[in-house]
């Protein structure tokens, strides 16, 4: 499995037909933050990662590249 966070996030957004804006709103961050993650310029903090897992009912391990979706 690919373990690069930006690639994992790109794939997740595409597979779930989510825009950066919709994803950001669902996890409580700004779209600009999601853009930075997608560009590989930043990585999510603990709270953002937790919110991703809770908002989309996906293990944080998936976003970390440890487990498959």
Functional labels for PLM-detected ranges:
Residues 47-62:
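DNA major-groove recognition helix of helix-turn-helix/homeodomain DNA-binding modules
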């Amino acid at each position: 499995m690919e373990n690069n966070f930006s690639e994992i996030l790109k794939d997740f957004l595409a597979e779930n037909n989510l825009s950066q804006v919709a994803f950001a709103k669902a996890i409580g961050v700004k779209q600009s933050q999601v853009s930075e993650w997608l560009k590989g310029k930043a990585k999510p903090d603990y709270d953002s990662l937790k919110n991703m897992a809770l908002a989309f009912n996906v293990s944080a391990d998936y976003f970390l590249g440890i487990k498959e979706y």
